């Protein structure tokens, strides 16, 4: 009897301890896991003819099915190129009439731009063999181009929400010497190389490229410093994505794409995918996220609407597109130069970083989020009030430092911060990079000053890429414009995260390359976030992909999508935007 009792006690006391994760697994509702889908690519298309000016030929294949829910991934790219030999000489068709034609790209120039001392052709052929060079009026070479002009000239991909190659030629002036007055040129500037203060005499005027209709410097103005606390990294990611969508003058969730994140095949990762991967490292209940954000505007611009001069790289790629529709070549063009181009916007920079807070450490140290908000953010003496951080007067930066030199309170708060994710855009690389390492008021102040001369585009309006062809002086491009429009519809569908669903319980569908995954919130498991601890929790709906266009009737056609990818559950929000889209035809 004693032996039996001892053996029973041994069984009870000597079983392996149940971990916290195993306890969670025991509570999780075991919903049915969706069937895995393997990635499928189409067969390669036939090679194109050899392009004589490139000695290159192309082929492509389509993404028939991205892998999802643990399916087998695809290897390789969807575009391919190979060297070739063409017996045809590289000759640009004469299409400029009495005007000058650039040798490499075929750009047409008025005769007064030839031998004017400026390279209006990328290859400089307009300045070859010049006996008499006519200098541009007022010797405009002394002026630097307006800050940020190269950034505004870039295309934009609304799927990845990233910049593409140049659409406008930001180096073309058309023989004009139009300058923009910088009202802050008298202000004292700091030269970090020489470590001295000086007046910016050289920055009194900047030269405006031809494709810019307007450019106006503005006194630095920020949007105020916002302070946001998130329990779930997915909610933080959605907020960041929505802010980017609104900055781009389009609400992605209500438009053609209807997806939180889409990655383009052929692009080696995206900024947002990298950010999400960092957040995923802290997908545990003990971590919260503090977002500190401000946007600084330094200039406003508007691009020329008509007679746009395209970047010569884009012009050359456009010339080489076939007249007959070839989705592979047109989709590669879109992937290179963007789905859209910028028509107007604002220059400046954004200062944003995410503090990963260890709530268990905070509780043991007696530290609150309000305490931490007064220490971090790169602004020094900042006061927290009603969910906002407000800079008061001159920011001294003496209130708190993470690496507190003898400051016990600062050290305590620093211990509560597990990680800092920096997302600074704009400004000189030295000061911008320094913000993530040194959050002093001096560093922030000089970063803000450097934005005037090293800005990025922070808010902008845009148009579909095929529309730019309507506003150039190029002839005989209507067939290619229609092909580009058709390819854009197909491209937006092929690389759309709607193909990745359904992700249940507010999981986020993500398409990276040819692979889908669902980013799950806290307490969710499974490849489709289908396993949850909470019964009856609200889950928002997500759109299916758009269906095919209907036949053209009375000058219009339509297509539909359904809010079933998945449908809303337990009172969750319906899908935003329209179920039916109409288009002139």
Curated annotation (Swiss-Prot):
Residue intervals passing through the bilayer: 248-256, 259-266, 377-384, 391-396
Domain LDL-receptor class A: 94-132
Proregion positions: 21-30
Positions of the MACPF domain: 136-499
All copies of domain EGF-like, residue ranges: 499-530
Binding site for Ca(2+): 113, 116, 118, 120, 126-127
Matching CDD domains: LDLa
UniProt entry keywords in alphabetical sequence: Calcium, Complement alternate pathway, Complement pathway, Cytolysis, Disulfide bond, EGF-like domain, Glycoprotein, Immunity, Innate immunity, Membrane, Membrane attack complex, Metal-binding, Repeat, Secreted, Signal, Target cell membrane, Target membrane, Transmembrane, Transmembrane beta strand
Domain TSP type-1 residue range list: 38-91, 540-584
Similarity field: Belongs to the complement C6/C7/C8/C9 family.
Free-text function comment from the UniProt entry: Component of the membrane attack complex (MAC), a multiprotein complex activated by the complement cascade, which inserts into a target cell membrane and forms a pore, leading to target cell membrane rupture and cell lysis. The MAC is initiated by proteolytic cleavage of C5 into complement C5b in response to the classical, alternative, lectin and GZMK complement pathways. The complement pathways consist in a cascade of proteins that leads to phagocytosis and breakdown of pathogens and signaling that strengthens the adaptive immune system.
Protein's name according to its UniProt entry: Complement component C8 alpha chain
Organism whose genome encodes this protein: Oryctolagus cuniculus (Rabbit)
Source organism phylogeny: Eukaryota, Metazoa, Chordata, Craniata, Vertebrata
Primary gene name: C8A
């Amino acid at each position: 009897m004693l032996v039996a009792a001892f053996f029973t006690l041994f069984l009870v006391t000597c079983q392996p301890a149940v971990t916290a994760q195993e306890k969670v697994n025991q509570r999780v509702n075991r919903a049915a896991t969706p069937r895995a889908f393997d990635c499928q690519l189409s067969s390669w298309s036939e090679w194109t003819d050899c392009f004589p000016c490139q000695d290159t030929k192309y082929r492509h294949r389509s993404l028939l099915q991205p892998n999802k829910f643990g399916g087998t991934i695809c290897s390789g790219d969807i575009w391919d190129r190979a060297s070739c030999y063409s017996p045809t000489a590289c000759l640009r068709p004469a299409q400029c009439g009495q005007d000058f034609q650039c040798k490499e790209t075929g750009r047409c120039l008025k005769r007064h731009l030839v031998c004017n001392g400026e390279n209006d052709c990328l290859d400089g052929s307009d300045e070859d063999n010049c006996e008499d060079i006519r200098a541009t009026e007022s010797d405009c070479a002394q002026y630097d181009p307006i800050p940020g002009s190269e950034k505004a000239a870039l295309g934009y991909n609304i799927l990845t929400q990233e910049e593409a190659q140049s659409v406008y030629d930001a180096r073309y002036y058309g023989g004009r010497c139009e300058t923009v007055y910088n009202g802050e040129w008298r202000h004292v500037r700091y030269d970090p190389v020489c470590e001295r203060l000086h007046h910016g005499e050289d920055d009194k005027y900047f030269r405006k490229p031809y494709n810019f209709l307007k450019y106006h410097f503005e006194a630095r103005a920020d949007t105020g410093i916002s302070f946001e606390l998130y329990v779930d990294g997915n909610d933080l990611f959605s907020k960041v994505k929505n802010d980017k969508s609104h900055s781009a003058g389009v609400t992605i969730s209500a438009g053609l794409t209807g997806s939180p994140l889409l990655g383009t095949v052929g692009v080696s990762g995206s900024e947002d995918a990298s950010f999400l991967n960092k957040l995923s490292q802290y997908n545990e209940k003990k971590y919260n996220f503090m977002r500190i954000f401000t946007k600084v505007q330094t200039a406003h611009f508007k691009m020329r609407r008509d007679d746009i001069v395209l970047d010569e790289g884009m012009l050359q790629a456009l010339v080489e597109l076939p007249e007959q529709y070839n989705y592979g070549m047109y989709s590669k063009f879109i992937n290179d130069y963007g789905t859209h181009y910028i028509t107007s916007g604002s220059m400046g920079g954004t200062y944003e970083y995410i503090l990963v807070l260890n709530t268990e450490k905070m509780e043991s140290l007696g530290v609150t989020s309000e305490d931490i908000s007064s220490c971090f953010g790169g602004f020094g003496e900042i006061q927290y009030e009603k969910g906002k951080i407000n800079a008061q007067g001159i920011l001294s930066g003496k209130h708190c430092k993470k690496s507190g030199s003898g400051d016990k309170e600062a050290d305590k708060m620093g211990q509560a911060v597990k990680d800092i994710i920096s997302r600074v855009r704009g400004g000189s690389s030295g000061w911008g990079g320094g913000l993530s390492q040194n959050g002093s008021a001096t560093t922030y102040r000089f970063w803000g000053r450097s934005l005037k001369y090293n800005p990025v585009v922070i808010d902008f309006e845009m148009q579909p890429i095929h529309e730019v062809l309507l506003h150039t002086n190029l002839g005989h491009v209507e067939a290619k414009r229609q092909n580009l429009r058709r390819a854009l519809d197909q491209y937006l569908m092929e690389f759309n995260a709607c193909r990745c669903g359904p992700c249940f319980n507010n999981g986020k569908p993500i398409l990276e390359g040819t692979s889908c995954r669902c980013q799950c919130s806290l307490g969710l498991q499974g490849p489709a976030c289908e396993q949850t601890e909470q019964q009856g929790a609200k889950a928002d709906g997500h759109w299916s992909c758009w269906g095919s266009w209907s036949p053209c009737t009375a000058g219009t056609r339509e297509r539909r999508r359904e809010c079933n990818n998945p449908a809303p559950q337990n009172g969750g929000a319906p899908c935003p935007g329209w179920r039916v889209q109409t288009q002139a035809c």
